[in-house]
Regions:
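Short S/T/G/P-rich N-terminal loop/turn motif that feeds into the first structured element of a domain
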Residues: 1-47, 51-63, 81-93
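A short hydrophobic/aromatic micro-motif that marks alpha-helical segments and, especially, helix-coil
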Residues: 26, 69-70
Length: 93
């Protein structure tokens, strides 16, 4: 099991755009992983947990397509973005 965790703070001015983007991407991302959990707290803090069956599934999907759009959207619409794979900080956030 491989788990990717994305933590960030949603920019208040871009909150509506963030939710629209997540709504359009969720189904596509869910089809390429075992589980997708997106949580937003009242203070606009965001935690996205993406679980893959194994390293092969993660490498096949997380570095291409919809996941690149997801990561790019989070990076452009949020602040203080941290991406971890199995609790290890991912290089080149």
């Amino acid at each position: 099991m491989e788990t990717v965790t994305i933590c960030a703070s949603i920019n208040e001015k871009k909150k509506a755009e963030f939710f629209q983007t997540m709504e359009s991407l969720t189904g596509l991302v869910e089809s390429q992983c075992n589980d997708l959990d997106i949580r937003v707290k009242d203070d606009n803090s965001l935690i996205i947990k993406i679980t893959f069956a194994g390293k092969d599934q993660m490498e096949k999907n997380f570095y291409t397509g919809e996941f690149n759009i997801l990561k790019g959207s989070v990076k452009s619409l949020c602040e203080n973005v941290i991406i971890k794979v199995n609790e290890s900080l991912l290089n080149n956030n």
